[in-house]
Amino acid sequence: MKTSRALLAAAGVIAVSSSSAFAIEGGENAQSKAGILIGASAGVPPPGIYMFDEVFTVQSNLTGPGVNTKLGGNTKTGVESAVDIQGFLFVPGWTFLGATYDALIVQPFSTASVGSPSNVQDAGMHDTLLIPVELSWKLGDSGLAVKTGLGIYTPDGTVTGLYGTGNEGSPYWTFQPELVVSYLKDGWNLSAAIYEEFHTRNTISQYTTGDILHADFTATKQIGKWTVGPVAYYYGQVSNDSCSVGCLYGTGTLMNPQRFNIWAVGGLVGYDFGPANLSVWATQEVSAKASNPAAVAATGSDFSLVAQGTTVLASLSYRLWAPEQAAQPSMYHK
């Protein structure tokens, strides 16, 4: 397996949500982009320092009961985002309990907008993602591998607005454990990646977003230098938001969905250039549902909204340094 191919399969690259332009937390305000572990696996590349660059765009429209109760029946309220990400993967060659250790740091920058009648835009630095530990076990020669790790979103992004949610940063921490199970043999990458977001309380608004569960699925085959195959993802909210004493939202959690479920399907194409690997995947969200039973009970109406649309993502990964390589002279050395 080429180094670049191993990196593409192994790097747990996690990017950002496209929902910051809502300027309110709760609901679909996930920190990680749905499907961001598509193409990844439970494998780990050879020791070294790797870099990856990712860009993606999301084009979607708001849907849900709130189309009628909030938007006056407007089904064409668009939500768009463009994101650029740089990240580093560190593989020192250490083992622990039979597992290979690695760590990552990821820094996204993004812009987002919501169309009429909201008409809001933002642009800035998203919260930094630190993954201080990932452990990967290879189960003999079976082709099976298992990886687990913990990601931490630090509240260091661009924060604006009355509640601190008017831009790409968030005034709260997010902890994200992950589990990836893969079959990696004969050119196949059959992987399921499951990860869940646990948010702390917003230090400005005192609002706490509920837990969000992600599941990404990859079924690709390497044919020569090409990799192709179908992909899919799910994400949804699995616990309620909370707006306790001191929360600045007068309506509490009534205006936000307390449950949503979104499914998407698509495909991936990759090419191994040797020193670097390029992959592109695209997905269409085929089902998006949201609800807030408490709002219906209290007001007779449901104001829930989620975005449903299309994502196109391109990723370039390559090794910066390997311990077995001799240092190269500078091109400016005399």
Description of each model-found segment:
Residues 77-83, 121-127, 168-174, 206-212, ...:
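Transmembrane beta-barrel outer-membrane domains
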Residues 24-26, 40-48, 93-102, 116, ...:
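Short loop/turn motifs that connect adjacent beta-strands in outer-membrane beta-barrel proteins
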Residues 51-55, 103-107, 132, 146-150, ...:
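Membrane-embedded beta-strand positions of outer-membrane beta-barrel proteins
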Residues 21-90:
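N-terminal, post-signal peptide beta-strand-biased segments of exported outer-membrane/organellar beta-barrel
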Residues 1-30, 321-334:
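Cleavable N-terminal export/targeting peptides
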